[in-house]
């Protein structure tokens, strides 16, 4: 199974790249993890936000293809680390690759939400999208470590 993080935005601060890459390199070869960045639409004073969201959504869904789609959204399910590890195991048994979608400043398009098989909430707080990339990578790595009895996670 391959994990994909499909995220709106292409110019992240160095600390995001450093943090994300640190966890990316830790993933085992039998569970590769990749980042697909979707260019954010231009948002200005007179921008048509619905059109921008729809276009970003189309690009995200195209990147996900036939993968299991899991959206990251505040109204999603809040999984603790053991629950995320259990989800990771279920995803592996399903046999499909998994695409986790992170929207832009206005969130995800209605099409992305409708296509999602699951929705995961990292927090009831609104988090900066660059930070979410690092949090998701670390959380998935920690969940993987539980499923393989790797010493990274300690009870």
UniProtKB/Swiss-Prot annotation:
GO annotation, cellular component aspect: cytoplasm
EC number: 2.1.1.177
Catalysis performed (reactions): pseudouridine(1915) in 23S rRNA + S-adenosyl-L-methionine = N(3)-methylpseudouridine(1915) in 23S rRNA + S-adenosyl-L-homocysteine + H(+)
Cysteine disulfide links: none
Reported impact of residue 154 to A: Loss of activity. Impairs ribosome binding
InterPro entries listed in its UniProt record: Alpha/beta_knot_MTases (IPR029028), RlmH-like (IPR003742), tRNA_m1G_MTases_N (IPR029026)
One Gene Ontology term from the biological process aspect of the record: rRNA base methylation
Subcellular location: Cytoplasm
Catalytic class of the enzyme: transferase
Result of altering residue 152 to F: Loss of activity
Effect of residue 153 to F: Loss of activity
Binding-site list for S-adenosyl-L-methionine: 72, 103, 122-127
Family: Belongs to the RNA methyltransferase RlmH family.
NCBIfam families (UniProt xref): PRK00103.1-1, PRK00103.1-4, tRNA_RlmH_YbeA
Complex formation: Homodimer.
Task performed by this protein: Specifically methylates the pseudouridine at position 1915 (m3Psi1915) in 23S rRNA. Specific for fully assembled 70S ribosomes.
Protein name as annotated: Ribosomal RNA large subunit methyltransferase H
Record lineage: Bacteria, Pseudomonadati, Pseudomonadota, Gammaproteobacteria, Enterobacterales
Gene giving rise to this polypeptide: rlmH
């Amino acid at each position: 199974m391959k994990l994909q993080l499909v995220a709106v935005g292409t110019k992240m601060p160095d600390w995001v790249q450093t943090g994300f890459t640190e966890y990316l390199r830790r993933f085992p070869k039998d569970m590769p993890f990749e980042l697909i960045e979707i260019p954010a639409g231009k948002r200005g004073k007179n921008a048509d936000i619905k059109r921008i969201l729809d276009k970003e959504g189309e690009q995200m869904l195209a990147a996900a293809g036939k993968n299991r789609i899991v959206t990251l959204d505040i109204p999603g399910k809040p999984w603790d680390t053991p629950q995320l590890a259990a989800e990771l195991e279920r995803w592996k048994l399903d046999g499909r690759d998994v695409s986790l979608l992170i929207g832009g400043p206005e969130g995800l398009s209605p099409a992305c939400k409708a296509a999602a098989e699951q929705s995961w909430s990292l927090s009831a707080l609104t988090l900066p999208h660059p930070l979410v990339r690092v949090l998701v990578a670390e959380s998935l790595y920690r969940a993987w470590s539980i499923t393989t009895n790797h010493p990274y996670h300690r009870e």
